């Protein structure tokens, strides 16, 4: 493909957009500039390929396609069937799964499909069988009332938020917390690692319908074989949310006991993050849950986004190429180089390092809250996000941690030497930032003091570091 093709495509697109609403075109240009000039260390972000991005910008956006392949509620969906089948095929082959459902719009949608598939299989289907009914519409009002009550009285066991779990795993602010009676397992207070004996004890005491594994801020591998054994011991369905580390599974960095697909009853994921695709979700499962999962529409979804499924097909095809395995290995090598560099400079990391794509810095050692550290780094051209640490004294808003991840910088081509240099920049900013005060003189958890000259100097150093690794080098918007 000609390098000029990508520039031509985006220049032409922006010209068309500018003719209608130039401010949108300006924002698109500004976003590219911002992404090119910032050290992006947000663990959940990446850079999708131009092919993936372009696959979303077409007339598939105009189609309704409620239903599944060959069974739509609308006519004229043959081309949607084609791209959905391609995306599902690539997902099955990439992850070694029996069944793939690629319609979810996001990770939470994928989780909701999985939750309701399990509820339908474990709760709804037995009720229908007892009532000798084929469909919920055939139930009497009394049976329907009883089923609704039973569906709302199920239990879920997942990782606690401050240990690195995710809001969508049954926590009260999220809809999943209103669906399930949820309990959490944590990590060892000394090591920060999952204590599988403690998980087993919690499962025995709580007897959940669903045991969830997966994380958004846990910097180590999870032994899914052990987790499946725990689930089996209490009759729970074992679900894994691999949204954060799907790229490491796809790239065969996580194998054996650390690959969730052979061990879980059902697996969910996003298609962005370390998988480097469009924003969206997917569900993987075996034949026993496939029929229920395919009822995601209308059970949870109003219908798929065909243009995003087209982009999923492209991104999943890219992930099946041999060079993706090298990319996945470099993500982890870069994360470990960043973590090691921070440790050598005296930073405190949760669990003392990383086995995956992220590290979690406890910034209380610098005398800061996560919010103060996040903003000071942003002022200096380093984009991160604040995150709670285990037993966090500052809560989920101000936090005591900063989460850093390497998928995006690895996509740009940065290596271990550059991540070592990034550790120095982070340490410099955090060491030279101090807490600020409120107007009444009381200590602030949000305000901070950083010499603008330091921020400018680090910004310049970050720009110099990125100069050799241009983002979307084939795209010149003029």
Swiss-Prot record:
Chain sites annotated for binding (6S)-5,6,7,8-tetrahydrofolate: 161, 165-167, 291
CDD domains given in the database record: SHMT
GO molecular function, one term: pyridoxal phosphate binding
Site residues, Plays an important role in substrate specificity: 272
Any GO CC annotation of this UniProt entry: cytosol
Pathway membership, UniProt: One-carbon metabolism; tetrahydrofolate interconversion; Amino-acid biosynthesis; glycine biosynthesis; glycine from L-serine: step 1/1
Keywords noted in UniProt: Amino-acid biosynthesis, Cytoplasm, One-carbon metabolism, Pyridoxal phosphate, Transferase
Cofactor: pyridoxal 5'-phosphate
Entry keyword Phosphoprotein: no
Enzyme class: transferase
Enzyme Commission identifier(s): 2.1.2.1
Subcellular location(s) per record: Cytoplasm
Protein family membership: Belongs to the SHMT family.
Function according to Swiss-Prot or TrEMBL: Catalyzes the reversible interconversion of serine and glycine with tetrahydrofolate (THF) serving as the one-carbon carrier. This reaction serves as the major source of one-carbon groups required for the biosynthesis of purines, thymidylate, methionine, and other important biomolecules. Also exhibits THF-independent aldolase activity toward beta-hydroxyamino acids, producing glycine and aldehydes, via a retro-aldol mechanism.
Protein name as it appears in the record: Serine hydroxymethyltransferase
Natural source organism: Salinispora arenicola (strain CNS-205)
């Amino acid at each position: 493909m000609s390098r000029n093709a990508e520039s031509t495509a985006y220049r032409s697109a922006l010209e068309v957009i500018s003719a209608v609403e130039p401010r949108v075109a300006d924002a698109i240009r500004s976003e590219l500039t911002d992404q090119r000039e910032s050290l992006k260390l947000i663990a959940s972000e990446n850079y999708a390929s131009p092919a993936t991005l372009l696959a979303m910008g077409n007339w598939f956006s105009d189609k309704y396609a409620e239903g599944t392949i060959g069974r739509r509620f609308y006519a004229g969906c043959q081309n949607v069937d084609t791209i959905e089948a391609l995306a599902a095929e690539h997902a099955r082959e990439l992850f070694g799964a029996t069944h793939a459902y690629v319609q979810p719009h996001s990770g939470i949608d994928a989780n909701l499909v999985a939750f309701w598939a399990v509820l339908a299989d474990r709760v709804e289907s037995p009720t229908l069988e007892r009532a000798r009914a084929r469909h919920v519409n055939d139930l009497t009002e009394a049976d329907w009332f009883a089923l609704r009550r039973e569906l709302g009285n199920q239990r879920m066991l997942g990782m606690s938020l401050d240990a690195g779990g995710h809001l969508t795993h049954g926590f009260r602010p999220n809809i999943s917390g209103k669906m399930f009676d949820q309990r959490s397992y944590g990590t060892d207070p000394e090591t920060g690692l999952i204590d599988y004996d403690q998980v087993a004890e919690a499962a025995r005491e709580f007897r959940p319908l669903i045991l969830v594994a997966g994380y958004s801020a846990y910097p180590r591998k999870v032994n899914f074989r052990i987790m499946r054994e725990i689930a089996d011991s209490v009759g729970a369905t074992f679900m894994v949310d691999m949204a954060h580390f799907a790229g490491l599974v796809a790239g065969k960095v996580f194998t054996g006991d650390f690959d969730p697909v052979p061990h879980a009853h059902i697996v969910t994921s996003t298609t962005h993050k370390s998988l480097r695709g469009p924003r969206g979700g997917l569900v993987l499962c075996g034949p026993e849950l496939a029929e229920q999962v395919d009822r995601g529409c209308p059970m949870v979804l109003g219908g798929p986004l065909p243009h995003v499924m087209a982009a999923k097909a492209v991104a999943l095809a890219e992930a099946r190429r041999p060079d993706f395995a090298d990319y996945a290995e470099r993500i982890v090598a870069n994360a470990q180089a960043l973590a090691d560099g921070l440790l050598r400079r005296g930073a405190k990391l949760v669990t003392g390092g990383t086995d995956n794509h992220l590290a979690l810095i406890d910034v209380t050692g610098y005398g800061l809250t996560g919010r103060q550290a996040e903003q000071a780094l942003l002022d200096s051209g380093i984009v991160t996000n604040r995150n709670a640490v285990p037993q966090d004294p500052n809560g989920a808003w101000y936090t005591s941690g900063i989460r850093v991840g390497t998928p995006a910088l690895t996509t740009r081509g940065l290596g271990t030497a550059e991540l070592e240099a990034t550790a120095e920049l982070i340490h410099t900013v955090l060491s030279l930032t101090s807490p600020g005060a409120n107007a009444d003189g009381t200590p602030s958890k949000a305000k901070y003091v950083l010499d603008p000259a330091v921020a400018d100097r680090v910004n310049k150093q970050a720009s110099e570091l990125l100069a050799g690794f241009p983002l979307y080098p084939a795209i010149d918007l003029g």
